[in-house]
Amino acid sequence: MTKLLAYFPSPPQGVWHLGPVPIRAYALFIIAGIVAALLIGDRRWEARGGERGVIYDIALWTVPFGLVGGRLYHLATDWRTYWGPGGAGFGAAVRIWDGGLGIWGAVALGAVGAWIGCRRHGIPLPAFADALAPGIILAQAIGRLGNYFNQELYGRETTLPWGLEIFYRRDPSGYIDPHSLDGVSTGQVALVVQPTFLYELLWNLLIFVALLYADRRLTLGHGRLFALYVAGYCVGRFCVELLRDDTATHIAGIRINSFTSTFVFIGAVVYLMAAPKGREDPESLRGNQYVEEEPAEPEPATVAATTEAATEGVAAPADGAEAAGADATAQRPEESAEPDVEKPESEETEAEAAEEPESEETEAAEEPGEPEAEEPEEPEAEEPEEPETEEPEADSDEEPEEESGEAPEQPVAEEPEPAPQQPETKRRWGARLRDRLSGR
């Protein structure tokens, strides 16, 4: 017997008991792989423009469907172990924690669950698959450590230095068997085999790095990155299947997983070549949640009501201004009527009658100067009524003369319409001149 220079030992056991509860390494690594895939997928989904946390919502559909699909594929391809002569029976078929998941069934039925989740959130399934692809292959690599602890899915016997030692294990009932999942190693080597779990683990890690690099350099989208993951994994799985020697279903002397890997590889390559280039629009990855957050357009009735309210608010001050203007206009006739009341009280003499032509000339001369009276009305315009002291007649005579001198420059015909107070101003000047000429 050739003495090995080196060897790769198997773990002494694959299950620990916490009281009556068994803690299985296989289940722990499966859970760890799922968590890693979701964490990576969530970060990648957000980087592509999607909403953070959507991956976890869709995982509520994807993970259960994937576990059921993986178990169904395992039962379909290894049915003799459960229903063949001396099979373990239906009870063992449902004990998924004992190991036995087929990756192709997990991917196929998991895709159905992902489609349901994506449809409910309004996001495209190919984009979701691209974001999750690197995490899936990493989860597969972590899950292979569970096969290592279970001493399962190993290869043929070998004399290579890195060969894997398979120990005999004794279960709680005392039965010794290298395939015992609940047993503890006796320290006795049963055989040395190819560590196929390690080969596939390393290959999966290589695909994980390659996917990240290709996604960054080539900006793959529309499901093309997921297709690249499937094609790459099929190549590695096909090669590993050639080294395995465990119990499996064969077709024409070839393991069934080799057939599956071949056909799935062809389908992945065809999709990779036919899918659209580039990536999806980031806005399409936000789904129904983004649509709900968009502000709703105001209804026409609401817009009309708002416009009417604004119009009424503007019209109200204008109406108030018009009312104030009307009140002011109503007061002006009363003021203009005051001189008419004073006229009967002043008795005109014959001398005043003789001087009336002069006052008429003065009034005519004052008309060209009326633009000064048309300036904005101010309280100062009524000052001529306030002074009680009499000014020298010379001053009063000079003012009309100066104004009469300016008369030819501005014809009366070109003057704008007189202000409402114009007649009142003429009467006041006429009354003052008559009073001063009469010696009052």
From Swiss-Prot:
EC primary class: transferase
Superkingdom as given in the UniProt entry: Bacteria
Molecular function as annotated in GO: phosphatidylglycerol-prolipoprotein diacylglyceryl transferase activity
Compartment annotation: Cell membrane
Feature: compositional bias, Basic and acidic residues: 332-346, 424-440
Keyword vocabulary terms for this entry: Cell membrane, Membrane, Transferase, Transmembrane, Transmembrane helix
Comp. bias regions, Acidic residues: 347-417
Taxonomic classification: Bacteria, Bacillati, Actinomycetota, Actinomycetes, Mycobacteriales
Family: Belongs to the Lgt family.
Low complexity bias: start-end ranges: 299-330
Biological process (GO), any one: lipoprotein biosynthetic process
Keyword Transport recorded: no
Membrane topology note: Multi-pass membrane protein
Record carries keyword Repeat: no
Name under which the protein is recorded: Phosphatidylglycerol--prolipoprotein diacylglyceryl transferase
A Pfam short name: LGT
EC number: 2.5.1.145
Function text: Catalyzes the transfer of the diacylglyceryl group from phosphatidylglycerol to the sulfhydryl group of the N-terminal cysteine of a prolipoprotein, the first step in the formation of mature lipoproteins.
Region (Disordered): 280-440
Record's GO cellular component terms: plasma membrane
Pathway: Protein modification; lipoprotein biosynthesis (diacylglyceryl transfer)
Positions bound to a 1,2-diacyl-sn-glycero-3-phospho-(1'-sn-glycerol): R144
Transmembrane stretches, start-end: 21-41, 53-73, 96-116, 122-142, 189-209, 256-276
